[in-house]
Amino acid sequence: MKDYQREFIEFAIEKQVLRFGEFTLKSGRVSPYFFNAGMFKTGGDLARLGRFYAATLMDAKIDFDLVFGPAYKGIPIATTTTVALYDHHNVDVPYCFNRKEAKTHGEGGSLVGAELEGKIMLVDDVITAGTAIRESMEIIKAHGAQLSGVLIALDRQEKGQGQLSAIQEVERDFGTQVAAIVTLGDVVTYLEEKLEGKVANQPELAENLASIKKYRLNYGI
């Protein structure tokens, strides 16, 4: 695990984006952790978030021409990622996002930003069922562009209804690569390191770690 990945996990915990406990998911599963990127909600949060996305994108070495953020959570992510790419990596790329409802006045249309063309890097917070990716693929195809890759914050590494994760299904169905700032495995490693580094007893930390490991045995890939 790289330093920026540890920093991202600490950042997510600090901002209560990553929380531990018992959370009932839409699938009905009771998860020992919850990730809500909507809790990144200040200018400073977004600036830091963009740096993590940009660093991961540079590490992934996926060729792309444009960053696309699906409405709604993908919009600020696409914006801050492209700013960070320019500020920290001297890479200046266009970005674009869609409206949920097309405008019928003014400039009109369902897209805002640059022309949706060439090789597209789609950015979002997580992939749960892959629905947003499939909807975005329809938009990308309609404009004659191609999906080059997908970048998300957290890979849950969790099976869907079958044996594959939602991410593996996206990679299979669209022949594309999905990169993540961190995986659930990275979170486990982070917690293990924290536990080993503490002299004092950390029952809550140990309990969270044990719960996640048990959950992974049942639902992990």
From Swiss-Prot:
List the cysteine pairs that form cystine.
none
Q: Which UniProt keywords apply?
A: Glycosyltransferase, Magnesium, Pyrimidine biosynthesis, Transferase
UniProt-listed InterPro entries:
OPRT, Or_phspho_trans_dom, PRibTrfase_dom, PRTase-like
Q: Name one GO biological process term.
A: pyrimidine ribonucleoside biosynthetic process
Whether Transferase counts among this entry's keywords is: yes
Q: Which cofactor does it need?
A: Mg(2+)
Q: What is its EC number?
A: 2.4.2.10
Q: Name one Pfam family in it.
A: Pribosyltran
Record's function text = Catalyzes the transfer of a ribosyl phosphate group from 5-phosphoribose 1-diphosphate to orotate, leading to the formation of orotidine monophosphate (OMP).
Full protein name: Orotate phosphoribosyltransferase
Q: Which gene encodes it?
A: pyrE
